[in-house]
């Protein structure tokens, strides 16, 4: 378990003090894959450096497995850091060492008896699928294979925690998928806690059990991955989810729906027309509930746009629907959606120019 309490970090700059982290509180359970995501400058890299105490925070505490780290001396920290493996974006392999030699290096530094090293390295290479490349040099293998070497090296001292700092951001989509599958497999086989630092929502969607969203050095949202995709609460999260799923309406689609709402208001004064964004999960995500809603409440419901994503085996649907009928029927339908615990965001209504703000795709 990783427990971070009230963590803050400030840097001195030529323009004054810069607050990189402010009041961070996180509880990461043992054995889970936890994502930390945010735009550039959000504080992600500073946070990961604080977790392994490469950067000392100005205030707050960091505990791993019940051991508080911020009060330890440098000598004590060296021992504790063996419990934390690190996978980097840039691989950081030694060019003059073979694949085998790079994985063996942390064992040599840790003082593992020489006769025990070969067996341990061979097991690690088998775990990451590189036993056939043991005698190759970094210049002779691909980027994805280099990252596998980095993962094996990070696991050499049997860490409790594996920190992945943008480990897939320099890889192509297929290689990224393979590396994420490997990390998930390692997590399941060894029980190591994996912390994924990333700016890619696609990475979070594929591997993370839970996710914390950082913005300007603060945690602005934290939830299960499927909940973050289904019902993002913060503007930063909504923007990142929309970009990853293309789940927002385009300007042209919104304008067309507004024209339909205006036309209905002119033709049928007193009637109601609402454009809703519905977020559904599980069995409801396919949209069968919508047809039931129309039938039960005598509504005319048009599907404007829909998308269903598989978030680690859970269907998460985003539906934009135009509901038209009497005001009472519309209110009854809203009550029914609330009873099913379905998130509803009203995007537009009559009159069309008196509508809430919308998160619109560019």
UniProtKB/Swiss-Prot annotation:
Domain ABC transporter: 2-241
Principal location: membrane
Membrane topology category: Peripheral membrane protein
Subcellular location(s) per record: Cell inner membrane
Keyword Ion transport among record annotations: no
Keywords assigned: Amino-acid transport, ATP-binding, Cell inner membrane, Cell membrane, Membrane, Nucleotide-binding, Translocase, Transport
SMART domains reported in the protein's UniProt record: AAA, NIL
Protein name stated in the entry: Methionine import ATP-binding protein MetN
């Amino acid at each position: 378990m990783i427990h971070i309490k009230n963590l803050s970090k400030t840097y001195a700059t030529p323009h004054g003090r810069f607050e990189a982290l402010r009041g961070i509180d996180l509880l990461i359970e043992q054995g889970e894959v936890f994502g930390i995501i945010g735009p550039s400058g959000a504080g992600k890299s500073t946070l990961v450096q604080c977790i392994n105490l490469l950067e000392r925070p100005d205030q707050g505490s960091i505990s791993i497995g019940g051991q508080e780290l911020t009060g330890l001396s440098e000598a004590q920290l060296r021992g504790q850091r063996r419990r934390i493996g690190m996978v980097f974006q840039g691989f950081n392999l030694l060019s003059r060492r073979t694949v085998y030699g790079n994985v063996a290096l942390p064992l040599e530094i840790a003082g593992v008896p020489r006769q025990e090293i070969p067996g341990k390295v061979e097991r690690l290479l088998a775990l990451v699928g590189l036993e056939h490349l043991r005698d190759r040099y970094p210049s002779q293998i691909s980027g994805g294979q280099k990252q596998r070497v980095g993962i094996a090296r990070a696991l050499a001292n049997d860490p409790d925690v594996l920190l992945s700092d943008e480990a897939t951001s320099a890889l192509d989509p297929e290689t990224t998928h393979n590396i994420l599958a490997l990390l998930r497999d390692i997590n399941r086989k060894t029980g190591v806690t994996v912390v994924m630092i990333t700016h890619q929502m696609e990475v979070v969607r594929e591997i993370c059990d839970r996710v914390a969203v950082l913005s300007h050095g603060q945690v602005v949202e934290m939830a299960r991955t499927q909940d973050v995709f289904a019902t993002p609460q913060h503007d930063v999260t909504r923007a990142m989810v929309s970009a990853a799923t293309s789940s927002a309406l385009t300007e042209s689609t919104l304008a067309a729906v507004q024209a339909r709402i205006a036309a209905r208001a002119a033709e049928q004064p007193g009637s109601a027309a609402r454009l809703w964004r519905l977020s559904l999960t599980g069995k409801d995500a396919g949209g069968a509930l919508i047809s039931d809603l129309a039938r039960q409440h005598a509504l005319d419901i048009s599907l404007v746009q829909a998308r269903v994503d598989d978030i680690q085996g859970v269907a998460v649907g985003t539906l934009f629907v135009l509901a038209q009928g009497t005001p009472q029927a519309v209110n009854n339908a809203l009550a029914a959606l609330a009873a099913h615990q379905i998130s509803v965001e009203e995007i537009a209504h009559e009159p069309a120019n008196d509508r809430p703000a919308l998160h619109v795709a560019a």
